[in-house]
Amino acid sequence: MLDHPKLTARQQQILDLIQAAISRTGAPPTRAEIANTLGFKSANAAEEHLQALARKGVIELVSGTSRGIRLRTDTVRNINAARGTSFGLPLSALAPLMLPLVGRVAAGSPILAQEHIDQTYSVEPSLFQTRPDYLLRVRGMSMRDAGIMDGDLLAVQSAHEARNGQIVVARLGDEVTVKRLRRTTQGVELLPENPDYPVIRVAPEEAFAIEGLAVGLIRNSMSM
């Protein structure tokens, strides 16, 4: 029998909301977004439930960031398995995913070129709502406030289109970067989630392409 904490109905709602937000945008929700979605009067009410989930070992709270919520993947997997679901998919229909881990990407070459693949990971499908195609090792702290830290493994679904606000893997010139996409009347901007880093404004003459969408995250402590 799987060992997992018992959640209240409200705690399960919040966990489902966190998982759905990470799958949809690549980042967890803010306290204000949780409060608004679930009808709490204030973000403080959401914080109380998050603290309870942290005490039960379901999530880890990262101080100093508005989106500092990180899933403890082993515990979440057990909870999903006990419910007989994996983000709405029948558990019995799922097999382990074999995902290539992409390290540094050479200028001008495809992300999934063989020379970029460091190794292949066997990953539980229950960690994701949207099936990823590969893992990308995060370098740097430009997405810190989205809960994406240096050394984390970002789960990426290959895609060439994205909605405003989604976290994307983008190619700009000879560089590949992970940022939040924003389209304006003036053009495309790539937004960091750390005030120490500048907004990247894509010039019309620059070579720019979306390579993928962030659909999940594996903490660096899990990737060793």
UniProtKB/Swiss-Prot annotation:
GO terms, molecular function: DNA binding; serine-type endopeptidase activity
Site residues, Cleavage: A107, G108
Gene3D superfamilies for the chain: Umud Fragment, subunit A, Winged helix-like DNA-binding domain superfamily/Winged helix DNA-binding domain
Biological processes annotated in GO: DNA repair; DNA replication; negative regulation of DNA-templated transcription; proteolysis; SOS response
DNA-binding region positions on the chain: 31-51
Annotated CDD domains: S24_LexA-like
Keyword Zinc: no
Domain of life of the source: Bacteria
Keywords, ordered alphabetically: Autocatalytic cleavage, DNA damage, DNA repair, DNA replication, DNA-binding, Hydrolase, Repressor, SOS response, Transcription, Transcription regulation
Record's catalysed reaction(s): Hydrolysis of Ala-|-Gly bond in repressor LexA
Active site: S142, K179
InterPro entries per UniProt: LexA (IPR006200), LexA-like (IPR039418), LexA/Signal_pep-like_sf (IPR036286), LexA_DNA-bd_dom (IPR006199), LexA_repressor (IPR050077), Peptidase_S24_LexA (IPR006197), Peptidase_S24_S26A/B/C (IPR015927), WH-like_DNA-bd_sf (IPR036388)
Transport among keywords: no
Listed EC numbers: 3.4.21.88
Record function comment: Represses a number of genes involved in the response to DNA damage (SOS response), including recA and lexA. In the presence of single-stranded DNA, RecA interacts with LexA causing an autocatalytic cleavage which disrupts the DNA-binding part of LexA, leading to derepression of the SOS regulon and eventually DNA repair.
Subunit-level organization: Homodimer.
Similarity comment: Belongs to the peptidase S24 family.
Protein name per its UniProtKB record: LexA repressor
Organism: Delftia acidovorans (strain DSM 14801 / SPH-1)
